Regions:
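Short gly/pro/ser/thr-enriched loop/turn and capping motifs at secondary-structure boundaries
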Residues: 9-11, 36, 109, 132-135
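Charged helix-capping and loop-helix junction motifs
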Residues: 12, 53-57, 83-92, 141
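Catalytic cores of alpha/beta
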Residues: 1, 13-16, 88-127
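PLP-dependent amino-acid enzyme catalytic core
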Residues: 8, 62, 77-97, 101, ...
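C-terminal helical cap(s) of enzyme catalytic domains, especially alpha/beta-barrels
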Residues: 15-22, 114-194
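Conserved anion-binding
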Residues: 1-73, 77-78
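A structural motif corresponding to the C-terminal end of an alpha-helix
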Residues: 62-70, 96-99, 171-182
Length: 201
């Protein structure tokens, strides 16, 4: 499977072409949404940096109509905070599409994951900071002081993405770890995370 966001928004017909060429089941449209002051949600591109002015709910519906097989839905507001998923956003998208919706952004513990699936209608969830910043130890149990880890602390320190050096796979001593998610509604999702050297430099 491949996930597409910026390319699809720049050329929505790309979804049609890709789904015809490879099948809908292989095409995941990633939507990065930010909540607005009027409680609407707009879609963003380039890792949540570029404003598009496109309504996220309408875009999800259009993505399905064009042949997307799944929606990977990221709440930029929640991502890296550890405050839990944006269940309102997930619910709004789930209510207008029939394809699976994968919720992403905000998970800090097992309750956030189970509550999101139970309360929002998500078919699956994706987790990132919980794993990237050591919220899970090696035997899979949760570390209690998650709030001192990862993006939350990074943002408090006024961190900038410019602080990160350029990386490529050949420079990383560890490459791919595959997390096989539970099977929901007959769909099996595999989320692949790149695990970079944590103490590099």
């Amino acid at each position: 499977k491949v996930a597409i966001n910026t390319a699809a928004i720049k050329d929505p017909n790309f979804i049609n072409k890709a789904s015809r060429a490879f099948g809908s089941s292989t095409i995941v449209v990633a939507i990065e949404a930010i909540k607005q002051s009027d409680n609407s949600y707009l879609a963003y591109t380039d890792n949540g940096r570029e404003h598009t002015g496109i309504d996220a709910i309408s875009w999800a519906r259009q993505a399905e109509e064009r042949g997307a097989g799944e929606i990977l839905l990221t709440s930029i507001d929640k991502e890296g905070t550890g405050d839990g998923f944006d269940t309102e956003l997930i619910k709004k998208i789930s209510n207008v599409v029939t394809i699976p919706v994968i919720g992403h952004g905000g998970a800090a513990n097992e309750s956030h994951i189970s509550d999101s699936i139970k309360d929002s209608g998500a078919d699956a969830v994706a987790i990132a900071s919980m794993l990237h910043y050591g919220a899970l130890n090696r035997n899979g149990s949760l570390v209690s002081d998650y709030n001192t880890e990862g993006n939350t602390e990074f943002l408090k320190k006024k961190g900038s993405y410019k602080m990160f050096g350029k990386e490529n796979i050949s420079e990383s001593p560890e490459t791919l770890n595959i997390l096989h998610e539970r099977n929901y509604s007959g769909y099996t999702h595999e989320f692949v995370t790149h695990q970079w050297a944590r103490n590099r430099g």
